[in-house]
Structures are given as C-alpha cells and as structure tokens.
Design a protein with these regions (language model features):
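Low-complexity, highly charged intrinsically disordered N-terminal segments
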Residues: 51-127
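A conserved hydrophobic secondary-structure block that centers on an alpha-helix together
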Residues: 228-234
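Flexible glycine/proline-enriched surface loops and loop-helix/loop-strand junctions
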Residues: 216-220, 234
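Glycine-rich catalytic cores of cysteine/serine-nucleophile enzymes that process amide/ester linkages
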Residues: 130-217
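Sec-dependent signal peptide recognition
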Residues: 2-11
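N-terminal signal peptide c-region/cleavage motif recognized by signal peptidases
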Residues: 12-16
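Intrinsically disordered, low-structural-confidence terminal and linker regions
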Residues: 9, 19-60
Length: 234
C-alpha cells in the first residue's frame, strides 16, 4: 500500500510545482525593489536602514514581516495568488487586484486560479471608473486647519460629462481620523507632525459637495487629470 502511495505523492508534488511558478531569488528581489511594488505597499526607506510601510493595518499584509520586508510580502502574495479559487471573496486576488494585475504581467502568470470575486465586481461596477478629477476645496474661515489644504479625487463614469451626472460620481478622500477633543495647541501640533492616523474613504461625491458648499460655503476648484480609462480603473 505504501509503495503505491509514493508515485501518487510524487505526482501531487510535481503538479503543485507546476501550478505555481518558482522565479529565481534574484528575480524576486528585483521585483521587490521595483518602484511600482514599493508604491503598492506604501513603502519608504527606514530612518536607519531597510524599509517601512506607511500602512499600519495588519490586514494589508500577507507576510508577518510584510510591513518592513517588501521581498517577503511579494513572496507571500505570489503564493496566495495560487490559493484555491473556492476561497471566493477571501482570495488574495479579490483583496489585492492591483498586486495581482502587476505580478501577472511581470511573471506572465497565465495559469492563475479564477476566483469569482463577486463583492469586488459589484463594488467596481457601481463606481464604473472612466476618468478622474482633482478637487481642491478652498479654505473654510471657521476652521483654520482647512488652510493647510485638502484635496480629493472625483471618479467619473463614462457619461459623466455628456449627461452632466457628476453628482453620481464617487470621491476618493484621504484625511485625518480625529477622536476625542484635543485642545487647539495639541490639535495643531499633532496635525502638523502626523499625530493623527490617516484614512482613505470612498464616498458619494454629492455628500462631499454638500459638506463643502452648502454647510461650509467653500469654493471647489476642479482639475481634470490626463488619465486614460485604463489608468483610472487601476
């Protein structure tokens, strides 16, 4: 019985090796040092040496040392891309579409599993990105902190201009998450020195428009970005 299992186990090992490519260490290190991969992980050089990521959410990383090791995160991502498609929305391809797209192109990954990614597909279709507009709200007189500037991106659909439907677009916003009631001195210090955590938020543009123009009476300056639909979709 044991002898008959040996060829079967060997076949399984070979099939697994064929399913997931094994790039050389040099190639993996080259990709890990690529500026695009470093941007995907929001990495910057550490104060003394090495790397560190601006992202402090452990769910963003697949490797235990991912926040400080771009190469380890890349290797863990490559392994996770070949997880069973039955994981569905929990699959790495669904959680990290930008990583998936880039690694597929760089390593010619033609045999990746095909998870459904239903939640991501629904979310992406709802946004329907086609073009992007940089929005700069003017300062709010009752809030001195607004003079430091605030920008956001408006993601428009294909018919946004022709049908004048910018109100149906989405706004990609990055801002400080402030809890409690810090005094003005502490608020200014923490605001200038990065003492508040920053969060990305995707909200309907009409909500931001109401906040800035109706509630705060602020002017909005719009600058359409020279991006293709493909670039906007990324």
């Amino acid at each position: 019985m044991f002898k008959r299992l040996i060829p079967l186990l060997a076949l399984c090992v070979c099939a697994s090796a064929l399913a997931q490519p094994q790039p050389t260490d040099a190639r993996l290190q080259q990709l890990a040092n690529d500026s695009y991969w470093l941007s995907l992980g929001h990495y910057e050089t550490g104060k003394l040496s090495g790397w560190r990521s601006h992202v402090d959410d452990p769910k963003f990383f697949l490797a235990a040392d991912g926040p400080n090791q771009p190469a380890a995160e890349l290797s863990a991502t490559l392994t996770a891309l070949y997880a069973p498609a039955s994981l569905g929305d929990r699959h790495a391809q669904c959680a990290f579409p930008a990583r998936t797209r880039w690694l597929r192109a760089q390593l010619q990954l033609q045999d990746l599993p095909q998870p459904a990614c239903a939640e991501f597909a629904t979310w992406y279709q709802d946004i329907a990105p086609h073009s992007a507009v940089l929005i700069y709200p003017a300062a709010y007189l009752n809030s001195p902190s607004s003079m430091f500037g605030h920008t956001l991106l408006r993601i428009d659909q294909a018919d946004s201009d022709s049908n004048n439907t910018a109100l149906l677009s989405y706004a990609l916003n990055f801002g400080a998450f402030i809890e409690g009631s810090d005094n003005s001195m502490l608020y200014a210090w923490k605001g200038l020195m990065g003492g508040y955590p920053g969060l990305f938020a995707l909200v309907p543009y009409r909500e931001k428009l109401a906040e800035y123009t109706r509630l705060e009476n602020r002017d909005l300056w719009e600058y359409r970005l020279n991006l293709t639909p493909e670039e906007t979709g990324r």
